[in-house]
Amino acid sequence: MMVNIGAFTGKTVVDPLRNVIGEQAYIYINYFSAAMTVLALLAVILLYKSAHTAGEGKSMREIGQGFLRIITNWRLLILILIVTGFWMVQQQLYATMPKYVIRMAGETAKPGWIANVNPFVVVCCVSFITRWMAKRTAITSMNIGMFLIPVSALLMSCGNLLGNDIISGMSNITLMMVFGIVVQALAECFISPRYLEYFSLQAPKGEEGMYLGFSHLHSFLSSIFGFGIAGVLLTKYCPDPVLFETREAWEAASVNAHYIWYYFAVIGLVAAIALFVFAKTTEFIDKKKKA
């Protein structure tokens, strides 16, 4: 919840800053992020006092051993790789969407506010969805979210396929992007809390915190691969207009810009099917062990 509150408030700076200094905003926003991170770190150092002081921290050797246990645990390793597929579709949005929307919908588009749809929906819905799915297994909840992800990518692609603007004053690119991000945020509500729950249940007693820390390996992997793929696809299907001598030449080069989202829909669908197979396989193995 706190992560998404921060995600929402942080993005409110982007569009006003871009209105003032133009594209340089995407450079200066990194300085803003660094400053906020330093302030948060100082606040933790100076103000945070743990209520639980019993026990000792782990040495780097123990942490390394814990990491080896996780990457040699086939069940957890496969789960991390599968969930990386979901987060690739999620993470790449911050690389693809701003340039896609500005290039396709025009300079007046507000990518910062469009991106804010995700944390807003998560903050509003995650508690309700988590309670609603409380009687279901973690894997069941995660499966629902995984199959929503390709739907979200397909919705995003529709903006370039529709004709006249459905809502006056809002381009179809922006409208369908918002719809897609809403579905993506709902998928996150189904997946994220239950993924952490599932991961913690695999941890030996007393090592839950360390296992939960390593559960976020998917963020590292999805950022690297998601952003890399986003750059390649933008260059191929929605290139920078400044590279073309005329508007007509750029329009011809970007006529299939929506193909970008098809790639991510396929990635999301493969990950969803993989999680479904993973769930059935592990369920069968667990039942066989109990028999």
Regions found by a protein language model. Name each.
Residues Y28, K99-V123, I144, S171, ...:
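Loop-to-transmembrane helix entry
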Residues R18, C124-I144:
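Helix-to-loop junctions at the C-terminal end of transmembrane segments
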Residues V101, C189-P204:
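Intracellular juxtamembrane helix-capping segments at the cytosolic ends
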Residues I166-I191:
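Hydrophobic core of transmembrane alpha-helices in multi-pass small-molecule transporters
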Residues M1-R18, A34-T37, A115-P119, S215-A230:
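Glycine-rich segments within core transmembrane alpha-helices of 12-TM secondary carriers
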Residues M1, T108-A109, T174-L175, A203-H218:
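Loop-to-transmembrane helix entry/capping segments in MFS-fold secondary transporters
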Residues F147-G169:
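C-terminal ends and interior cores of transmembrane alpha-helices
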